[in-house]
């Protein structure tokens, strides 16, 4: 059975000896007099030395990541949805994974890529079995796939982006999605899992917006500037459609190099039929060359992500 022994957010924490009622954690945390101090919080976890301790990180902050090495070195397992640990510079990344391997401490981060899809586990299993990754093609953004799969030329691209924002299909500032940065970070994680030593700046990124959109002073201004991209995007859509192809935002990893960009795919491609916020990963390996392994499913959602 799972026993909750500590919990914190950016403001308050509970880190005593007593177990916390899981159905009351929210109210208990809100009334806690303890101000969050991750140094104290992680120190208490190590000091308590409970059997089968697990540190769970569901933030997007770099602060918890600073304590990963110490936790792993003290046999505290880590389960994290936070991509920052696996996208920091290669030296720190290597140190972190060495800490986990040295003590054989579990370090799980499946949801870093593909929400609840079993991407990381499958990749690790293939490599551990002696397989060798030749190429990865992946649609890794539910937001990007929604925009590109739903666009049919009937309404401007800027209106579709606005609809995605209003319905929480995108980040509050859609530029966080359209910049391609999040996809690049997921791409970086996959490349490193394959054994390639690369840094985030090494990845070639094509944003799904103009430089003027990125430079807009706020979200309102961004949407005004985005209207100027409606016609160029429509022309690109029509050009692909005339060849029987569809546009997809794809990460490609091959020969130690990585790129994320808009790609045209034909009906024979695994990404052609993707709809909504689906993610899809195609793995071409030594054992799966003629018919690449394809992993496909929801790329977003509370239930599937938490299950991952």
Which residues fall in each region the model found?
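Substrate-binding/catalytic subdomain of NAD(P)-dependent oxidoreductase enzymes
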Residues: 150-151, 159-273
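Rossmann-fold NAD(P)-binding glycine/threonine-rich loop
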Residues: 61-73, 83-111, 115-126
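General beta-strand structural signal in soluble alpha/beta enzymes
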Residues: 54-57, 78-81, 107-111, 135-138, ...
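Short acidic, glycine/serine/threonine-rich loops at helix termini
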Residues: 16-22, 90-93, 118-124, 148-152, ...
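Catalytic, metal-anchored helix/loop core of enzyme active sites in primary metabolism
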Residues: 135-137, 145-148, 163, 169, ...
